[in-house]
Amino acid sequence: IPHKDCATDASSNFSSDALCAVLPQFTWLPKHVFPQKRSYLMKTTIIGFPRVGSLRELKFASEKYFRGEISAEELQNTAKELQSTHWQLQQKNGISLIPVNDFSFYDNMLDTAVLLNAVPERYRALSLSPLDTYFAMARGYQGEHGDVKAFAMKKWFNTNYHYMVPEIEDTTEIRLAGEKPFAEYAEAKALGVPAKLVLIGPFTFLKLARFTGEKTLSDFVEDTVKAYCDYLAKLNELGAAWAELDEPYLVKDLSAEDIALFTQIYKTVLVAKGNVKVLLQTYFGDVRDCYSEITALDFDGIGLDFTEGKQTMALVQKNGFPKEKILFAGVVNGKNIWRNSYEKTLKILEQLRPVCGDIVLNTSCSL
């Protein structure tokens, strides 16, 4: 449980002290919360960690690269150093499952598009390096290789963040094409990091993408499902323990067709999970439209938002929660830097105790 005496200076940059304030030193639960156990150390995780660095190292290194002042290798080295620092900071502060692949040079939706080979032809035609093609999609490109605009940007749900909108053309071949999550997992594993691989889920990716030709979302479902099955197969090969698939689109108002699509996708994807435990992670609200469908599927863990999800507690208490699944309870507000309320967290856990088995303490969204 986040320790009630852990405080921070709100004016400071995001650092070890700030992490201590948001999801800090964890302690033993009071006996009355889980009386059947003499003591119970809750496992903890976060959905994602800020990537820019406490001194904005990523921002400055990226700007130097764009100006031609450092090489691609130097930029990549800065990224690796930041990731290593952030992983070790989380370990130091008692996080049990540490997100990997939450880092991005620009945007996680853009990363997912590249991973799934959704790179429009106008960017391929530039014949740039993979890194520069990525940045051309993010920022546009004007130079000797051509002149193209960047992807459009849209508001990321109810936050001030804006994501890059993937473009899927009629000729796009959705398939597992990138290596980023697997390379980062290997780096984390080498450092002894208890990793949880994080990726935008197939349902949210397809719902937020823009289809630029005659084909529609339904034309790409089969290939997208195959790509995610291949992703899980690769994680099995690497020996990964957990895969987090983020599906924030589930908190929106869903139609019957949306729910059917989500169910169709995951009935197939989850067959491929093998020995990898799959966490369905939601955030920015509750899943009132699809709670029964979510809990009926073969997920090993389900992440629910108890901070912004107005009906989340009622959904769990009214409908129950599968005892064979782990609840990743989003009780720590990921949107601010204030210390977590120890008493409020205990109250939520006491309410969940009669209906839930294993619980992992989680943030409500990425930090």
Locate the predicted segments by residue.
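Charged/polar low-complexity intrinsically disordered segments
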Residues: 4-5, 36
